[in-house]
UniProtKB/Swiss-Prot annotation:
A Gene Ontology BP annotation from the UniProt entry: proteolysis
Keywords assigned: Aspartyl protease, Cell membrane, Hydrolase, Membrane, Protease, Transmembrane, Transmembrane helix
Disulfide bridge partners, by residue number: none
Lineage: Bacteria, Bacillati, Bacillota, Bacilli, Bacillales
Protein name according to UniProt: Lipoprotein signal peptidase
Length: 152
């Protein structure tokens, strides 16, 4: 199914980008891409977003395995008839597995995309995080649009 190819693409790009960061940048170093907006910063995270639940790897292992199983089940059941849902779930699946690979093999997640939004220093993130967020946003948009159609 094409949605698994999307997940594999996300995993590949995520893992290659993280490998490049680990091999070519010292932890904590930063390269400006757009001054005061976008940087490539070598960072590690032993928890979830904003460092929540730091060093609770077994929790993340269990949650991720259950979550991935749910996503695969949901994809098999609903993605055949709903392309946008399939794409969204493919992005979410790829993102979840990308960060899971880091947690299993590194005991931490490699983050490197560092954004400043106006004066807010947004937490450093990675390709897997981006795919997860985009997938969730697409599902929310689809849900809102379907809700609007139902009301009409």
């Amino acid at each position: 199914m094409i949605y698994y190819v999307i997940a594999l693409f996300v995993i590949a790009i995520d893992q290659i980008s993280k490998w490049l960061i680990v091999k070519n940048m010292e932890l904590g170093t930063s390269i400006p891409i757009i001054d005061n907006v976008l940087y490539i910063t070598s960072h590690r995270n032993r928890g979830a977003a904003w460092g929540i639940l730091e060093n609770k790897m077994w929790f993340f292992y269990i949650i991720t395995v259950v979550f991935v199983a749910f996503i695969v089940f949901y994809m098999k059941k609903y993605a055949k008839t709903d392309k946008l849902l399939g794409i969204s779930l493919g992005l979410i699946l790829g993102g979840a597995i990308g960060n899971f690979i880091d947690r299993v093999f590194r005991q931490e997640v490699v983050d490197f995309i560092h954004v400043y939004i106006f004066s807010y220093n947004y937490p450093v993130f990675n390709i897997a995080d981006s795919a997860l967020c985009i997938g969730v946003v697409l599902i929310i948009i689809q849900t809102l649009l379907e809700g609007k159609k139902t009301k009409e």
